[in-house]
C-alpha cells in the first residue's frame, strides 16, 4: 500500500496517536527529521568505512536515522543497513549477514533494541569474534574516569546506546516544535479551529522558549524520554489526537491543557513535575486566583470555589507558557527553576568541590545520626547479631577521612561523546584509598 504523503492535520494526528517512521513516506520522514550531532557522527562513521550498532529503547529513532542515512546524498553505495534486527526471529541469519558485510569491509548501520542485543550476545558471543567488540563497547558507554576509559576509536564497529541520549535539550526541542508548526500543511490564517489556534500559539517565541525551559528541566530527571515521546507529546498538544480541527474549541483543546491530558512518558512527567498546584509562587498564585474569581464572577464565592479552582488551574497552566502575554510581572521559570537544585548541581557539575564533598558526607552521615558537624569524615556503622538473633541497634567505631573520597560524574566514553548529549541520572561517591575503588551511587532519592 502506498503511504499517504500528506503533511496536514491527519499526519500530525497520526503522530499524536503513535504513527512513526516505519509507516511514513520519505517526504513525511524528511519533514519531521530532527537533525542533531548524531547525523554528522553517523555520516563520518559510514564515510570512514565503519559499521555502527544503534541500540536503545523502542522509539529512540534508530530506524529513522538509518532511513535518513540511506537517502543521504553521497552515502556509500555498498553500505549494509538493517533497520530493525529486533524483528528478526533468527539471530544466526542476522549474524551471518553481518559477518559477511564485515568480512567485505562494507560500512553500515544495524539497529537493534537493547534487550534483543543482550539476548544475542548471551546466546552467540562465543561463536562470532566481532561480538566481543560489541559487548565491550556496550559495557563502556558510560565512564567515570576519562583518563582510564577504554577507547574504541580504531575499532571497525561503533556501538551507540541511544538510551543515554538526552532528547529534551534546547536545540532538539526547538527543532521538534518548528517541524510540527512550520513544515506541515497547517495554516493558522486559514481557519480558526483548535489545531490552527494551537499551531499559532506554538509559533510564538515566548511559548517556544518556555517549552524549551520546561523540557530542559525535565531532561535532567532520571526518566528516559525518546524522540517518539517528544513528537507524540507535541503532536498531541497541537491536535488532541484529532484529525479534524474543531471550530470554537473549548478550554479542553487548548495546548496548555492538552499537555496534561495525553498518555505517554512526557505527559506523566508534566503531571508529576509541572503540576500548577505544586509549583507555587505567592504573588503569581494570588493574582491568578483573583483573575479566576473575576472571570467566574460568582455571587457566592464559597459556592463557586470548585469552579474558581478549575479556572485558576487553567490560568496557571497558561501562565507557564504565556507568562509575558499575561503580564503579571513575573516569569514562569520562577515557579520551577529551583526544583531539586542542590541535587542537580551535585550531579551535573564537571568537578566536585570540597564543599560538595563535605555536604554529601554530611547528608550520608545524617541517615544515622545528627550530622550538622560531620562533614570531614564518613562514619562507618555496624549492626550485630547476638546468639544468632538480629538486633535493631547499630553502632559506629570507625570513620574514613574525606581525603579518601572523590565525587565522580558519569560521562559518555570519549570515543562517542560527539554523537549525542548525555545527562547522568546520578553522581558517584568513590573511595579511592584501596586497591580497588568502592563506589556509592548517589541518586535523587538517596540525596
What do these predicted ranges mean?
Residues 66-73:
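A conserved segment at the C-terminal end of the G1
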Residues 75-125:
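Conserved nucleotide-sensing/catalytic segment adjacent to the nucleotide-binding pocket
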Residues 47-48, 103-106, 187-188:
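Short loop/turn elements that form and flank the Walker-type P-loop nucleotide-binding site
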Residues 1-10:
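Interdomain "pre-motor" coupling segment immediately N-terminal to P-loop NTPase/helicase cores
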Residues 181-431:
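Extended alpha-helical coiled-coil/bundle linker/stalk regions that scaffold oligomerization
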Residues 45-66:
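Walker A/P-loop nucleotide-binding motif
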Residues 10-46:
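N-terminal pre-Walker A segment at the start of P-loop NTPase domains
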